[in-house]
């Protein structure tokens, strides 16, 4: 999706963003749809994060992107059901999953379930369905899916693609180092034996008949999902300009309507343990060919901590990780769904002892002792 992730696993995608004050810069809010936002000098579309075009020296952003350099995802009020897509009354943890819109018109969420106090080590993936991407999801209408045990932070992501030999639609879930394939969202999902993707925590993409994945700072490609498939290097993601102490992880990769490539990440700073509402949260890299990648010196963060809901409440998430963009069936980016710490707020958890760095537990590590969940945010269009 991205029209090429093609509907990465769903025919859907999503996004969001924020400009964090860095080195004396102040946050900037978005303007009218499709209109330049505040005077900002640009000479080329690259200066607009490839999320818009440079017109008359100013960036004209594609919704839901906004800001002077089109680097921030605009949020809108999200249905309250989106705060936690799996019931918070269950003490077990989820940590985001894959959402795919089916031909039945339902949204299918595939989410591994972890024991209380853990974010890894399971062989059970739940299958929930909803009439709206923001839920509420029903978790008792589809059987659980048995998977090979996965560790922490290794999927699932999804890709929907067309098999060139049969011209049939294939649904795939990427997790635990392997790929599970089905002809229907109701399964059965069968692991492709003898196939592995590079590294862990995949960011798969299907484009022009080939598969791509991001691991670390490398983009890999393979022509087919077959046993014994070999991955070759396609490009390198430069981290030049990324501020000191920023650590990008959890990539999600897609292509936009202009065939530009994008990667959005959760990012964090292990020195930040107070005032978590302004802590580092996300990053964005972009490319015109998937080989040469860019990061703007403004250090714009695409998504932010605080979400407003239609029941009048607001929630500040201490961390939002494992971002997945959700695109609708027309290829429009409408939502972003993420793994979320559902408990701790701006106060952080610096005085805890487990998972500490430099004498304190940083904002993003509160999750290890809190309730982990899956949340979704509606983007402004």
Regions found by a protein language model. Give the residues of each.
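Carbohydrate-active catalytic/glycan-binding domains of CAZyme proteins
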Residues: 25-381
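Cleavable N-terminal signal peptides of Sec/SRP-targeted secreted and luminal proteins
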Residues: 5-21
